[in-house]
């Protein structure tokens, strides 16, 4: 599998959100608990906030409009200001002799603070943060734009991420090759989707 460009997700693909999540999202969890309408769902919400866009969670658990607005206002301000360690195998990503792009969905301040804390700024040709609270863009839109602007053939592009319903689905809809990064083997294999748990495996594939 020879590629000229690889597009990476950020959360749970380059680092573990679970390593910082309890601290980062503590104000959000407190807000939801104080609201009192999601007590029976809190454990699930705590887990899902670490790996899914908040807007989807609020919709799935039927947050009130007021709670959703308060939560989004809070999340728009949240930043993480302590050091963040990327996955240990991320060092192998830095060495890849291809064009690398970072495409992440989330609140701008929060995602930028993660990037800054890991020092990723110079590792990628471009970094794209898609903030659903201010933009209707999708990862599919960004992938397509990168391919168009840089004149890549689709077969020269690979997308790597942890979310089957986000970057993996978007890439498949564009006809791009994908690799599903499942660091801790949380999920069962899916037919037709190549899965890895380490970037050492990526080197073997490339």
Q: Where in this protein do the model-derived segments appear?
A:
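Asp-based, Mg2+/Mn2+-dependent phosphohydrolase catalytic module
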Residues: 1-4, 101, 112-206
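Short beta->alpha linker loops
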Residues: 49, 88, 106-107, 163, ...
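Conserved residues at beta->alpha junctions
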Residues: 12, 102-106, 162
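N-terminal helical cap/lid subdomain that shapes the substrate entry/recognition surface
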Residues: 2-89, 94
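Conserved Rossmann-like nucleotide-cofactor binding loop
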Residues: 13, 108, 186
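Glycine-centered loop/turn motif at secondary-structure junctions
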Residues: 33-36, 62, 97, 119, ...
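Substrate-recognition element of Asp-dependent hydrolases with the DxDx(T/V) motif
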Residues: 68-72, 78-82, 90-118, 126-133
